[in-house]
Amino acid sequence: MAIFKDYLENKSPLILHGALGTEMESLGYDISGKLWSAKYLLEKPEVIQKIHETYVAAGSDLITTSSYQATLPGLIDAGLTKEEAEQIIALTVQLAKNARDKVWATLDDSEKANRPYPLISGDVGPYAAYLANGSEYTGDYGQITIKELKEFHRPRIQILLDQGVDLLALETIPNRLEAQALIELLAEEFPEAEAYISFTVQEPGTISDGTSLDEIAQLVGQSDQILALGINCSSPLLYNQALAILKNAGKALITYPNSGEVYDGSTQSWKPKDKDALTLVEHSKDWHTQFGVKILGGCCRTRPNDIKALYAEFRT
């Protein structure tokens, strides 16, 4: 696999997929519970494909599979057999591919010439997503070991790669040990895989578990397989300081913040953003100009129109 590396050498920044769960909610679907939007892989997979299609049409260059919450333990806990759970994870790749190919076939030659053929990124959410206790924002995994984290992540990564994703999206990582486990797992068992890794931050200068961003930059900088590094699922107000540090890893930079609203893990609800807050496009322009950010998108509470606005800014 070397296609992601080739795409990063393009002059224009790459545009990410936006939020999936937010779109499910906007369509009236209840995503509460441990599986979040992944439960609709069981009940309404066609709705997930339709949301992917909306993002492809909006201009996304990286189409992220709906496997963030789809883990073997989580799906088995929901009553599936191991084989059924594996099939559901594989389905996330097929839905993303179907959406990409369906929309791409509708574009005219000038539209295709203005953007690269979208890649499929296999979403590898954190252990925190399985715990479903808000630890994406604390990094508190208790006494878990690096071996246990590798065992947790291995089967999903294997399935995603077997299904032909172009890269892995190791995202919303709140914990240094988990980052180390993922980097080692790729090197030891999936040496041909390409990936990006993205962390959550709650305070300036550290990821969510308190590890310094300097230490994270050093850790990620040692991996030949991690081609991009950044921040997601965090307040955009924390990004400038984080990017100034993470650029020292020598990787392409990636940003996909939340909308500016603040998530309260204790109540599982969102607090409104400041009415004077910058838009996603305004923040992204700043990060691209200041730090050369190569991959731009949005996370929680962002919508297809946000991705469309990024496309309009950076591609037209």
Regions found by a protein language model. Name each.
Residues 1-316:
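Domain-level signal for soluble alpha/beta catalytic cores
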